[in-house]
């Protein structure tokens, strides 16, 4: 009864007004799954290919009708008749059909849409929530959220170099409380920014995007907002950064336009981070070095990897092969997991399992171009990731994930776990 009888893709819009892919999967029993695919702004060089049409007469070349056609024809022809509950076989069939390292034939947006829609259809067939279907009886840990409340870099039209300044309400007793704390700090930050005469428009991920005097001023206004909301920095709330350093790196030098010393070597940039970590309750730095600066990554990990979470995003691109090399070389201590970087659920789960076996933490993440799809909320609980990064406390495309986590926590009731500070299990206390 779990046999796939139809697969259908369509072109829809993401949160930035760009086309993306949505896929429906129908089973013989009448069970149904639907998934929409996200899209990134700052992307790693080794990410699986997001197939776009390139036809400038439609959506400025960003249409996805080629990917839609690949799903409705080539992929559907191969998968119709297969069992939806055999996720590995289905994903492997698509990998075989594509035959390229980065899914450049079918497009990772095509394969991911199908992969996730199949999982949702199988969950519907089994009468299970998606997190229970993927993770089984042990899926019960609600993630500590990384809330991106101030944006810079490629996520905003301002003069701030660092792409994301995030809060982590680690002192909360449950996810619902963490969400409330984050929302209160978000509104306090708006008040702080207004009081200083700054613009309170928001960026792609719902965080404020003011023109500030320096990158450090972003930390200062967030600290002020935490206190204004009635919380203690370092106890109730921790800070996290996504530097997106690949965007700042050229010819072996990092350029931060908003700093007095604009150009920095890898060692000087690490000195800059260490100084911030010493003065602010920063627990996590993502993409602190450029994706191809592996020597810089090693220096950063050796210097700060026992004290804070060093997260690889563009570095690892959710790719088990690249992650394995990083583990062997002692680079980073955490992986950011983005489903569309690799393009199938099976490969995503493989990367998560590999990271956990190596003692790396895992952070399940959205992209800057999102939809109302809430799959990543279920995935975070399914794999007991412990952390999720899904934007600020406004914009429905971000809040949809938080609201889904509230529902999951309610469903799990007394079985739900929320670890707070303890999610950083690989750091020295």
Curated annotation (Swiss-Prot):
Cellular localization per UniProt: Cytoplasm; Secreted; Cell surface
InterPro entries named among the record's database cross-references: Enolase, Enolase-like_C_sf, Enolase-like_N, Enolase_C, Enolase_CS, Enolase_N
Keyword Metal-binding: yes
Reactions mediated catalytically: (2R)-2-phosphoglycerate = phosphoenolpyruvate + H2O
Cofactor note: Binds a second Mg(2+) ion via substrate during catalysis.
Pfam families (alphabetical): Enolase_C, Enolase_N
Catalytic center residues: 205 (proton donor), 338 (proton acceptor)
Residues annotated as transmembrane: none
A single GO cellular-component term on record: cell surface
GO molecular function, one term: phosphopyruvate hydratase activity
Binding site for Mg(2+): 242, 286, 313
Binding positions for (2R)-2-phosphoglycerate per the UniProt entry: 163, 338, 367-368, 389
Family the entry assigns: Belongs to the enolase family.
HAMAP family referenced in this protein's UniProt entry, alphabetically: Enolase (MF_00318)
Stated role: Catalyzes the reversible conversion of 2-phosphoglycerate (2-PG) into phosphoenolpyruvate (PEP). It is essential for the degradation of carbohydrates via glycolysis.
Name the record gives this protein: Enolase
Organism name: Pelobacter propionicus (strain DSM 2379 / NBRC 103807 / OttBd1)
């Amino acid at each position: 009864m779990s046999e796939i009888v139809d697969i259908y893709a369509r072109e829809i819009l993401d949160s930035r007004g760009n086309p993306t892919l949505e896929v429906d999967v129908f089973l013989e029993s009448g069970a149904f799954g639907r998934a929409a695919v996200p899209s990134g702004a700052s992307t790693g060089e080794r990410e699986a290919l997001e197939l776009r049409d390139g036809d400038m007469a439609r959506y400025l070349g960003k249409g996805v009708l080629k990917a839609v056609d690949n799903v409705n024809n080539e992929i559907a022809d191969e998968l119709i008749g297969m069992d939806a509950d055999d996720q590995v076989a289905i994903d492997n069939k698509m990998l075989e059909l594509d035959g390229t390292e980065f899914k450049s034939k079918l497009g990772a947006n095509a394969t991911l849409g199908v992969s996730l829609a199949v999982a949702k259809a199988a969950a519907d067939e089994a009468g299970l929530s998606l997190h229970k279907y993927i993770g089984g009886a042990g899926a019960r840990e609600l993630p500590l959220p990384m809330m991106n409340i101030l944006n810079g870099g490629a996520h905003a039209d301002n003069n701030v170099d660092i792409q994301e300044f995030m809060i982590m309400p680690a002192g909360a007793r449950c996810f619902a409380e963490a969400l409330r704390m984050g929302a209160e700090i978000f509104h306090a930050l708006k008040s702080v920014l207004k009081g200083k005469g700054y613009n309170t428009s928001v960026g792609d991920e719902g965080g404020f995007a003011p023109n500030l005097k320096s990158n450090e001023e972003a930390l200062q206004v967030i600290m002020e907002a935490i206190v204004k909301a009635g919380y203690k920095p370092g106890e109730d709330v921790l800070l996290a950064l996504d530097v997106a350093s690949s965007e700042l790196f050229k010819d072996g030098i990092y350029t931060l336009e908003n700093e007095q010393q604009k150009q920095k070597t890898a060692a000087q940039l690490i000195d800059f981070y260490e100084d911030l970590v010493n003065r602010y309750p920063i627990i996590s730095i993502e993409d602190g070095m450029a994706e191809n600066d592996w020597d810089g990554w090693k220096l950063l990990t050796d210097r700060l990897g026992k004290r804070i979470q060093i997260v690889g995003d563009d570095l690892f691109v959710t790719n088990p092969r690249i992650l394995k090399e990083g583990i062997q070389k002692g680079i980073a201590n955490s992986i950011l997991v983005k489903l569309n970087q690799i393009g199938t659920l099976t490969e995503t789960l493989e990367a998560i399992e590999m990271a956990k076996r190596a003692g790396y933490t895992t952070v399940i993440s959205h992209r800057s171009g999102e939809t109302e799809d809430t799959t990543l909320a279920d995935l975070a609980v399914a794999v007991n990731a412990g952390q999720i990064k899904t934007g600020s406390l406004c914009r429905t495309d971000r809040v949809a994930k938080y609201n889904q986590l509230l529902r999951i926590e309610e469903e799990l009731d007394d079985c739900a776990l929320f670890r707070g500070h303890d999610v950083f299990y690989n750091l020295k206390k």
